[in-house]
Amino acid sequence: MIIDFHTHTFPEKIAERTIDILESNTEKVQGVRSKAHTDATVAGLLKSMDECGVDISVVMPIATNTKQSSTINRVAQETNSRDRLFSFGSLHPMQEDWEKTLYDIKEKGLLGIKLHPEYQQFYIDSPESVRILKKCEELGLLVTLHTGLDIGVFPPVHCMPERLRRVLDYECSGKNMIAAHMGGWRAWDDVEKYLV
């Protein structure tokens, strides 16, 4: 069985526009436009899965502002009713009802949350982040973190391996945390130094 554990989809009405923005951002930051592998719709993901022999995909939505989480988590729950797809939930670390949102995510049967410190503009070792990480650990929710650089975002980088190490040493066990991109995209020496 082949499982793609880190995928992204968007509602059909915004998918094309969102992909254009993300691709454009990579061109601004990297000087080269990085093309998406699918059209970012659920149908596009399923088609890609069929073409590549992927049995199951896990979708990682990202709440990029404090007002999106209820819609994102409702769509995530709907995604989980489909064959072959599982979706995490999301919340924004600065939203006031973060704790209630985590309980809602748990109640909806979602496996965990996706946090993207670059898109959400928070440091992984900030108090706002740590309180969420601790609560997720308490609730038994997985946390997938974007770690290291993002090809479409200018520095500073908000989740470098050294910052994640501080969280693991002083705040959380990390047993429920998944550091995407091998612990720090394009920060491989720091991954080896702080996380291996």
Give, region by region, the residue ranges found by the protein language model.
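Mid-domain alpha/beta scaffold segments of enzyme catalytic cores
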Residues: M1-R131, K135, Y194
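Catalytic pocket-lining loop regions of alpha/beta-barrel enzymes
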Residues: L111-G112, D125-V196
